[in-house]
Swiss-Prot record:
Protein name: DNA recombination protein RmuC homolog
Function: Involved in DNA recombination.
Coiled-coil intervals: 32-126
Domain of life assignment: Bacteria
Amino acid sequence: MPYLLPITAAALLILLALIIWFYVKTKTFKTQLQFLSEQNLEISNNNQLLNQEKIGCLQKIEQLKCKVEYQEQTIKDSEKIREESFSSAKAALFDLGKDLSKQLIEIHKMENNAARELAEKNIATASGKFNSEFERLITMVGALNKDIEQSKGTVDLIKQSLLSPIGAGLLAEITLENILKSSGLRPNLDFIMQYGLTTTDSGKLRPDALIFLPSGNLMVIDSKASKFLVDEQDNSGNLSKTMNYHLKSLANKDYAENILTNLNKKDQNFNNVITLMFLPTEQAVEKVIAADPEFLQKAWSCNIFPVGPAGLMNMLSFAKFQITDHRRSENYKVIIEEVRKLLSSIGTMADYSQKIGNNLHNMVTNYDKFAASFNRNFMSRVKNIHKLGIDSGNKAMPAALERYQIVSSKSEIIEVEAENPPQIEEKL
């Protein structure tokens, strides 16, 4: 039937697979059996070798046993001899030890007496030093307590001073002055501290610092502080009110207009003014921003820039660079004039060197002419006189004077072209 063919084929395949599996297993078992046979043979050989080694070890053990018995007998004999000698030595040492004990006891008594006396002396000395040091320590502790009490009073006074409006303001002014002094700017030239001026309506203004920038620019710094910046308690509301009052006061003072008017009267022309509100610490800036997040925006709208020590140092560094560059540009004409004088002095030196060279040339030429005349005329007559029998004595006559000549040549100027020569524009 047709459906039996697949079943038969499947059965044949399964049977074939079983035959292959059985064949593979048979081969595997044969291989394992052969391997085990080889291992068994190797183990048998190893057992024979081990038996031979065992026999050899037993023989060595017997030999060592005999040696041990002999050594034990020898040890027993030596112990017996040692006991006898020890007994005789013990009797002799007993007598000697008795005498030594008496002597050592006497020496020990003497040493104990000396040690006791020395110890008592050292204890007395140490006790005296300890008492004196203890008294000094008590005195120092008393003085330290007084100093601590005084320091506590001073700290309280400083804290109260900083918590007062005047003390906080002085702290900001002192910090500002120290930063300006360490910035490298020149006092009374690049900046002025505590500049007082009178407004048009006879009012008094006193900015903490003025910094004169190039190109008619002016930087005004006014330090502001509050006791709430120093106080550790959370006074965000009071701090915000105080700093906004300072900002309003600074904006109403109108520093820019009044300072420009005052300085222009003194023939100092300034066009632009930048106003800085200086706070004594970076933490103070963070406290103000935390108390009033819109404080910076309010200040910027009034053309006032709140800064701490770090921000002020950055602006002062840039200001110093501008001032130095402007000073260098102002000294440009002076530098040109000094270079012109230097070139003129170089020309004068060249004239003098030319004259010295001419004089040297004339001197050497005249000397050469003198040497030629001396060698040709004078020395020939001296030789003739010497041939006539007149001796010069101990002095040897010179053979001839050396002659010198100067070779003059025009110096050549070597020009080297630069890779990137600077372009110089001539100004008429």
